[in-house]
Amino acid sequence: EAGIPTFVDKPLAISLDDCHQMIDAAKEHNTLLTSYSTLRYADQVKGLQDRLENLGTLVAGVSTGPCDFLSQYGGPFFYGTHAIETMLAVFGHSVKNVTGRMVGVNCIATVEYESGALINLNLLGNAAYAFHIVAYGTEGWESVPIDLSSCYANGFRVFVEMMRTGRMPLTYDQLL
């Protein structure tokens, strides 16, 4: 309400209604608003984004990360956000359909994109702590473990750039 640029550490909120209230307030008070997992700005994620077209037409992919469905901080919204945002950063936001299956504390979802590409999203509750992304194209494939050492500084720079330029790094629709 004070018009101060705002960064909400992931997730933006754990209910769609709360997300809409925050976005509406930002619009009403003409203030910048963003929220993201800094993993989307890790060097390895950016590198795969830059090289994705070299793989030809995207056919399939995998995004994997830890998740605690029972977390006191909003269940899967707290930690699962990392693997989801990594997927969206690399493969885009044009998701058509999502189906999933939960077994114990692990969930595997199949994310169908408008292009027809299928992405397996692995939200793992009892596997070794790791973030990983794979892209399969018609001309090649690439598997990328994600190192967290660059993401925090890169994510901070994105927020500073938002304040400097007055342009949000993600649209309101992408925040949802």
Where are these regions (language model features)?
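Alpha-helical hinge/cap motifs
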Residues: 3-5, 9-11, 166-167
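C-terminal helix-rich "cap/oligomerization" subdomain common to oxidoreductases
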Residues: 1, 114, 162-176
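A contiguous active-site-proximal alpha/beta segment in oxidoreductase catalytic domains
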Residues: 7, 12-73, 83
